[in-house]
Amino acid sequence: MTAAAANDDWRRYRPATADFDGRVIMVTGATSGIGRAVASALVQNGATVILHGRSEKALEALYQELKPLGPEPSVAQLDLERAQGPQYQQLTNEIESRYGRLDGLLHNAAILGDKSPIEHYDIGLWQRVLLVDLTAPFILTRCLLPLLRSSADASLVFTSSGVGVRGRAFWGAYAVAKAGLENLAQTLTDELENTPIRVNVVNPGGTRTKMRTRAYPAESPASLPTPESVAPPFLYLLGGASRGVRGRRFDVREPTTPA
């Protein structure tokens, strides 16, 4: 991935009136943190959003919250730790039946795992993290590519991390998964070069989320930007304003900012 231009236009992006009209966009990990902030902003700006999460209760609460704010969203309950091929295909069939296409897909769902030396990293946990953070995005993308191809302007966005570009001690499976996600995005960029599907990566940097608190329990959340404040680059990439932008990594904070 090529780093995005240094100007801040995409950091401060505010959607124009028609940027999301008629666009159907799926957000994974939509019930909390950055996923929730992006999903909410998309609905409020006119997109039809497919809300993904693993908790039916959390999805229903989010659906009720967002329903009055814009086009009616839909929910896609799928546990990425346990889902098998048939469940992914069923979800794909439901999206195709309801919408006929997909204009955007944000891969945001992830789990942290442990911050632990490789020597002591639990093998089962390692496998879980790679399954949710890397394998699941691959499977979901593979299943949904035909629906993305049905769009005149489709956007595929991956949420990455600074440790996906340069590994650091104790970040273990999470760092390895994010590095794999960066490579998956690069591979897709090349493979989809002559299609309407554009692929980009966003590294939001440290953000006020539950995952960040788990990673840095002694850190003051007030010192970090809110999920809402880092949402604009995601909106920029998922909407029509970024048509033609592909193969870029957008570091919301400075590239050297710890994840």
Per-range role (PLM):
Residues T141, A177:
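Active-site helix of classical SDR
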Residues L91, S116-I118, D122-Q127:
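Substrate-binding pocket helix/loop in short-chain dehydrogenase/reductase
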